[in-house]
């Protein structure tokens, strides 16, 4: 197996409290390595376009957060899968916090799905290394050359038509490639799998998946993990139930997901129409604008981290003006870099709820209005036309805006997945309703979705919902309980009594579940996960056996 990794010490110093150099000049307690692991299976080719996944993309990708100095033994490894349009950077704050809590007795591995290999991070890396975010703007939007390289732009969808086959099976086999780096004898006792949003569904899919030739041979995912962690996602049922006819060749149909409109194609349409292979192309938005939003977020986050109190000039960048106008209805206001990030991602201003956090509020005149871009959604907007400078206050925050800006500033990963494959959404929705086949004759099993072992999945589960997020009640988690047998080590007691813990975090948005400030409460999500992992792990893992 070919493994590529980079020790990221040289770029970790920007993470406050969890970096190679802290504010007092001492060595930080967290190291990060970026891994790309060659997979040992073949992704099918697009049978219509006759295109195959290139060999350079046949890698599973993750980032390993571990303590410095590295201990000889670990109590557990937590592996985290991001959600829809999410990248490994979503877990940056959570990973560093959990690693530091026990001084290294828990490692965290954050998954970047293989589409991250399509990203060109040259401009962001140069911007960070020079502490000059304007370099990223010049590289991505003005044709600037960095180290002899110019930005080639968004890949033409005709050149990535092979992504029609990047569905559930490939995603879970990539995840299994990562988990398989840990020796078998430690997995069922010391490896925990979690996910956020759609990633929570993928985590429970993995637990119920069969990687063998079922029923002749079985290789269930739950035998590789000690527990499952659901973060504002998962449970039973995703959006609605899909028929086989809709999946294979149905007409296009529209869904509303937290204010964003998706027009979802069938499998045959994804294969026939290259423009539909990435989910950004399905939004009721101009695709380049939506992809620019991801770049905009990272650059504005870097400005907010490096120069929080300086007046922002990113608002006036031509490529971003359309985004600012769509979100805020005003491009003439002045704001500090930190306030600009708040305007971009705080729940008062961001109309797409799955991309918002509770960061505080702006200091300056505001108005409440209905978003012109997302009908029916009420947001706040700045009203001043440049006579004063908006600043940011953190009163009432749940997520620390500095933690969010640090995660957005990552240049070894991203907080978003620009090229999220549509096929993975299609497969995930197909598993809605009763959530997964129970027989090999089920059409979903026949289409390669081998989520067959819910009735045998005995790993313990802990689930978190956001009171202002996606899972606002316990209902979908309770429905999931009904699919599962008693948990291991629960002496046959039903899941309602043992082996399934549910917490709804009051007023948390979808991102607050990941980024909530641990200083606000000792009973925060990070601490609850850490303590739950220690309660459910057995023995230890020698770090000498890890990659």
Regions found by a protein language model. Name each.
Residues 447-450, 456, 488-547:
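Catalytic active-site module of serine/aspartate enzymes centered on a nucleophile-bearing elbow/loop
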Residues 128-184:
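Alpha/beta-hydrolase active-site loop
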Residues 25-70:
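N-terminal cap/lid segment of alpha/beta-hydrolase-fold proteins
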Residues 89, 470-479:
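Conserved alpha/beta-hydrolase "acid-adjacent" motif
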Residues 16-27:
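Bacterial Sec-dependent N-terminal signal peptides
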Residues 239-468:
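Alpha/beta-hydrolase
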Residues 194-199, 203:
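Gly/Ala-rich beta-loop-alpha elbow adjacent to hydrolase catalytic centers
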Residues 67-133, 138:
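Short, surface-exposed "cap/lid" segments of acyl-processing enzymes
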